[in-house]
């Protein structure tokens, strides 16, 4: 009997190269080994600057996209290793030097501390009393609150987690080496976007959320339930006991049969009501600890897991079913968009700068959204009454978001200069935006002027009227009202429409929109925020600073390759000081210079946001609840009357609230006083770089070198003044560092002193 021979199975696709790059410590030990001119060693002091500028600029090391991709991939593992080491350090501090157990027993009266300053020559002033007889530095990272929410009940668990972090760091370092030197992915692996989406959506986000939901259900919820009921932390069963002893869970949530298989039967038989005790839909905040209900969070993570696991199965990989990203993009055309998104698939799979630009813009925006949500819908127990932590987390997420958004514009401009291919982008959305960039930028400029003159004009008007003694003619809640009616409408909608828009939810997402005061231990955790004329005015300042930042950054991207002034700008590269000595008026036009200028406006923008937040919360939200139910706010509700003119901002915010940092000497907060002054100095120091010319310094250096030659101590490496770009980079770095540290010291001394 003969059989038809089966077709030969297609060979398994090999998507890695074996041993592509030898491991050479000898090579790595040579500074600048990645660049031919740098590897020759330093002749002038410019060498060290170029070394830093090019070390991670993989495009300058090689033009091979596959090698660049591998370097980025390997660097990601290195980055993760650094993150794990850093996190491990945080957990180790919690395990070894903190008052976590004491805080867990009394989170209302004891402040978190996880660092004790060792005495130098008997110096003991920096360790303050944080309650419970513990002397240390107060921390404001929110980690204690996160640890409690996760179900960590003692320092030994933190120590184990810290060790786990170091193990993960080691694995990541190994993976970074292994995937560059031993088994390096081919370019096609990096460009296989459907498989990547499946992996990231279903694997990382889907299974990650499912794992976290499982942790919350089996560990965090029962432990927090016991802690909330007053069970001492050392008497709460250990995490694994809740998993291995179903009787413990049955006692708390009797409607489910907590067996390994029987526990999930209701999920697959759609009998979901059985889970209603711990997968809830309460809405709002838990009145006992002022945080989002942990049972709502578990419900959320389970739902998110299901959504992402489904989403991870939408894309076409080995089985010929599902979506193709290229097809989706090429089909995406509107009536006014020409070829639509055609070509963007090629852009995003051949330019990692383009990919990174989008990711940075989105993650930066997400960080800013996180800042807004974390205070209004506090996720962790007792964090809402730790005002120092609330202001720190808000400020942190705003700054991070601002830097990421600017980074998005930076890499967008680098893409335009290094990777943009006109042949790929023919009449698609990107090409069409570039062709009407003049209309976009001129309109955006008009918006900035309109917002700037009007928003600033409100304040100038109010200062003038107040100076002339005419309060009735001021824009205010008691004079000429400018009420934010749309914001107030959204607030009332969120408060009143719950029954019709989300019929199963018990309460609005946050009391900030309206409703009752959530007070914990006599302190306001969250309450309705009343918006008025002062908010309307400062929101238009926010609008102005956001639009100006966008104007600068978008202009940098859209004009990175060419402009009327310099038609061949793309040939000059991403960063250049001016277009040569023959052409005047061509300085500060490079893509890099737009990022440089954009950073200053980002700083302006975020500063005003965090100032507004800090004062508004102290004035209208944060405070103590008296026995008769009245609320005593930290600054007594002075925002509405004082924030409507410039004088009020200077007098009642900057000056009045810097009392604590200025008077901090001789107290446990004295380090903030030193930082406040030191950071002012760093900020002022930046101006020396920003307002000086390169030639001035070169002349000075040559004079100093002459003196060294006279004394026969001339250096072998020739000193050079910083280039124009280097000077600007040093200047903006110190400007931002000085400004941010000044603000940090100002806020923390203030809130540390308030307790």
From Swiss-Prot:
It is a multi-pass membrane protein. Its main location: membrane. Its EC number is 1.97.1.12. Phylloquinone binds at residue 697. It catalyses: reduced [plastocyanin] + hnu + oxidized [2Fe-2S]-[ferredoxin] = oxidized [plastocyanin] + reduced [2Fe-2S]-[ferredoxin]. GO terms for cellular component: photosystem I; plasma membrane-derived thylakoid membrane. Chlorophyll a' binds at residue 680. GO terms for biological process: photosynthesis. One of its GO terms (molecular function) is 4 iron, 4 sulfur cluster binding. InterPro entries: PSI_PsaA, PSI_PsaA/B, PSI_PsaA/B_CS, PSI_PsaA/B_sf. Chlorophyll a binds at residues 688, 696. Keywords: 4Fe-4S, Chlorophyll, Chromophore, Electron transport, Iron, Iron-sulfur, Magnesium, Membrane, Metal-binding, Oxidoreductase, Photosynthesis, Photosystem I, Thylakoid, Transmembrane, Transmembrane helix, Transport. It is an enzyme of class 1 (oxidoreductase). PSI electron transfer chain: 5 chlorophyll a, 1 chlorophyll a', 2 phylloquinones and 3 4Fe-4S clusters. PSI core antenna: 90 chlorophyll a, 22 carotenoids, 3 phospholipids and 1 galactolipid. P700 is a chlorophyll a/chlorophyll a' dimer, A0 is one or more chlorophyll a, A1 is one or both phylloquinones and FX is a shared 4Fe-4S iron-sulfur center. It is found in: Cellular thylakoid membrane. PANTHER family: OUTER MEMBRANE PROTEIN, OMPA-RELATED, PHOTOSYSTEM I P700 CHLOROPHYLL A APOPROTEIN A1-RELATED. The PsaA/B heterodimer binds the P700 chlorophyll special pair and subsequent electron acceptors. PSI consists of a core antenna complex that captures photons, and an electron transfer chain that converts photonic excitation into a charge separation. The cyanobacterial PSI reaction center is composed of one copy each of PsaA,B,C,D,E,F,I,J,K,L,M and X, and forms trimeric complexes. PsaA and PsaB bind P700, the primary electron donor of photosystem I (PSI), as well as the electron acceptors A0, A1 and FX. PSI is a plastocyanin/cytochrome c6-ferredoxin oxidoreductase, converting photonic excitation into a charge separation, which transfers an electron from the donor P700 chlorophyll pair to the spectroscopically characterized acceptors A0, A1, FX, FA and FB in turn. Oxidized P700 is reduced on the lumenal side of the thylakoid membrane by plastocyanin or cytochrome c6. This is Photosystem I P700 chlorophyll a apoprotein A1. The gene is psaA.
